[in-house]
Amino acid sequence: MSQSKKTVALIIMDGWGHREDTTNNAIAHAKTPVLDRLTKETTNTLISASGMDVGLPGGQMGNSEVGHVNLGAGRVVYQDFTRVTKAIEDGDFFENEVLVSNVDKAIKQDKAVHIMGLLSPGGVHSHQDHIFAMIKLAAKRGAKKIFLHAFLDGRDTPPRSAKAPLEAADKVFEELGVGKTATLVGRYYAMDRDSRWDRVEKAYKVIAKGEGAFNVACAIEGLENSYSRDENDEFMQPTVIGDAAPIEDGDALVFMNFRADRAREISRPFVEKDFSDFEKGEHIDLSAFVMLTQYAESIDAPAAYPPVALVNVMGEWLANHGKTQLRISETEKFAHVTFFYSGGKEDLYEGEERILIPSPKVATYDLQPEMNSTELTDKLVEAIESGKFDAIICNYPNGDMVGHTGNFDAAVKACEAVDTCIGRVVEAIKKVGGDCLITADHGNAEKMADETTGQAHTAHTSELVPFWHVGQKTTARSGGTLSDVAPTMLHLMGMEQPAEMTGKPIVTLVK
């Protein structure tokens, strides 16, 4: 029988930032006896998870994709957001071969260029400036028909904040003298990632067919009507603006979201002829479907900014040294502990196993703030006790998923549920003589309302995140970032870190 392994577990509490001010702070208000005890008894510090420390523009809040890429890479990774923004500033964006050649194909046939994406200054899944640059590129290439299909945010931005981006889009069209916003739909429908195809179908039908729940004269009227129905930006029902502009054979469609996880589902019915998750009707024979970045290897479409290969990320380094690893989370964050943590690689490494716990099927997670954390912990504890794994990467989605709802009381419950689970995990790790690192990918639940506007604060924050180490005797340094976490794990495992990992261990073993 093989010897049991002394597991090193990385527990990522999604959306769990540190904020001294307890006002509207669900984490501070939650009863968290386990983490309170760990703060008193174990090595702990605060680390950075936002801005330039994770490869984002200075001051930009962190997010789950960026967080997990940095956690797994062991180096600061230049993010797609920054990459595209820089290309626009340099002018390279307007010469991008994939964008230019595919837009030109439609223009030569006197066909329309459709642009879809999250029209938001949020910077998590997209940025409105990227969308405006794409509209300008299409106009510059000579497109006479440019249609914007705007997804509304209200999740990474205040719940009712779409007016300014919509007005800015109208201004761009006015200045160019061509194009218009054709449809509006909340991201709840257009950006699902949990196979809720009934939602995606509604978004697809309004974008592709011009079939919405409502028809209005202009975007602002549509938005005001949505608010009068008590629908915040995120939940706005599919709305057609003016004369419908359905997508036709020969048209080009450019998807301007740069983050992959919530872009995959809505892409598929446009790309796959034999798509069958809902009845989409006649397949549209597009001249091109272009992804801003690669959403998945399985989506057969060109990417304007394909992934930059990351060599010797944590998963690869472990596999190359004959180590075993487990990735485990609920559906909502499964892509993060697998695809993103592996630096954009879908496939399993040698010695890697994965456990997916389905997230609860509820409309919004404030209805079940504990989500399926108990089942997740059952499987996680079982894996630790099995002695099979050298390394375990686990994500608890609660702080982020419930934080995004803006429901303070539910967020408190979510944090309490996670604390209880952490208690079980720590006990299991202690039993097997392993090490446990507990941290977060970004903040969220520590700020649930905006003091200035009085609105719910549903977005991430730029706060530092906590970092605890349970296990061998260590001391911690200050000034760490997410990219220092993989080197910390390797240090605790007694392994060298690859040259590509430029991060430094946050804790040092005390001899």
From Swiss-Prot:
Residues reported to bind Mn(2+) 2: D14, S64, D441, H442
InterPro entries associated with the record: Alkaline_phosphatase_core_sf, BPG-indep_PGM_N, Metalloenzyme, PGAM_B_sf, Pgm_bpd_ind
Keywords: Glycolysis, Isomerase, Manganese, Metal-binding
Cofactor note: Binds 2 manganese ions per subunit.
Top-level EC class: isomerase
Catalytic activity: (2R)-2-phosphoglycerate = (2R)-3-phosphoglycerate
Protein name as annotated: 2,3-bisphosphoglycerate-independent phosphoglycerate mutase
Native species: Pseudoalteromonas atlantica (strain T6c / ATCC BAA-1087)
